[in-house]
Amino acid sequence: MRYLGGKARLAKRIAAIVDMNRVDGEPYWDLCCGAGNVLAAISPRGPRHAVDVVPCLVRLHREVRDGIFVPPAEATRETHAALRQRAMADPLCDDPLLAFYGFGLSFCGDWFCGYAESPDYDYLGAATRGLAKKREPFRGVEFLCVPWQSIVDRVSGTVYIDPPYAGTTGYKAAPPHD
């Protein structure tokens, strides 16, 4: 699934570096998990925890992990517009379909930034396949929907954090990080 800043191309290299000094059984924390690409590439040799502040995204990850999320068989511009309206009206809504459309079927993976469609690319298929590939790597992961700052005292082990940076494109689905 496309996601602005999702690290899809770099995830395996980042995970190799993060895992390099991690010992067996050591907890791993991804404090701004976003699309979960780095998380999916981390070895499962200890407890894994993933944190994000976007309720529908966290629920989508949980449902993918548990094998209960069913992607739509077809996607339309009208459904995208209706879900966008719903997401803007209720930013705390945890419907995983909002995350699927809002990131996976939006231009460049940017939260409801225009419906992504092209005769040359199957966005629905790509988002569906991308999530299916994460089911196995997400097994056993604890997903938390909280600001990472609120759980720092309970974090131990290896930590990966790549928060949104000041002066870059913001995340409309999340409150400002700066």
Where in the sequence are the language-model features?
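Class I S-adenosyl-L-methionine-dependent methyltransferase catalytic core
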Residues: 1-178
